[in-house]
Amino acid sequence: MADVVPAEEFLELAGGRVHLLRGGTGEPVLFLHAAGGAGGWLPFHGLLASAGFEVIAPDHPGFGKSDEFPDAEGVDDLVFHYLDVLDALGLDRPHVVGASFGGWIAAELAVCAPHRIGSLTLLSAAGLRLPGHPVADLFLMPPAKVAATLFHNPPPASSSAARAPGTPPDLDAIIAAYREATSLARFCWVPFMSDPKLERRLRRVTAPTLVVAPSDDQVIPVEHARRYAARIPGAAYAEVPDCGHAMHVEKPAEFASSVTEFLSAHPLAAGESGVSR
């Protein structure tokens, strides 16, 4: 069952407010969203919460309802931002799950502060530089092309997306999308969607790690996930057929099942979970 209703909260940090959704009870799971996944409680979140975990889903700086945090200029700054978030939540060593851009942040966090990560799950994580397998440039794509690129079977356009002739566009949605695209560019435009030093530092990851890759990832080629799995000591690897980049959206039940099985096999040590309530 995926009927957990999340609570909406705001954390007050030195640089501004962080918006988050939290639901479920049990060992804490910090979920770091993809570039387009701020502010939503997805079916995957509900499934994981219903499986006996407390899911905590914050919005990155400049995304969703979180403040800008203008001093955060790169992914390295986001690492320290999320260490502040962990401290504010009273979390010592939570499970950390990251999707795409959020997976990159999660990997850097596990490299920089391995003692703060109970387990690590990476889904279609960005962050590596593989010249033979470049990351798609979503900034240059029209919205329809983005949807076709993110999914193996793109969902039909919602009724809200189809406007009658003469109907004004949703300016709030346009402004929010522009803000988030600007924030993403601030963090990862140069070098583009990668940290050239990350690959050689992945040996520092000590947490149990699961790397999940959709076989039909047209945004971040599957070779990136395979490289993550090869470089992180002891990492488990799972490749899901007939699925696109946004696997946690396209196949939430399958992804939740893989994550639940992995987290259940790697429970947090007694006294280290930092359960926040």
Model-identified regions with their sequence ranges:
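Conserved alpha/beta-hydrolase "acid-adjacent" motif
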Residues: Q218-H224
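Short beta-strand/loop motif that positions the catalytic acidic residue
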Residues: V205, V211-A213, D217
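Flexible "cap/lid" loop of the alpha/beta hydrolase fold
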Residues: A107-C112, G118-T149
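Alpha/beta-hydrolase fold catalytic core
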Residues: M1-V29, S50-F53, D92, T260-R277
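Active-site loop/oxyanion-hole signature of alpha/beta-hydrolase fold enzymes
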Residues: I56-V97, S257
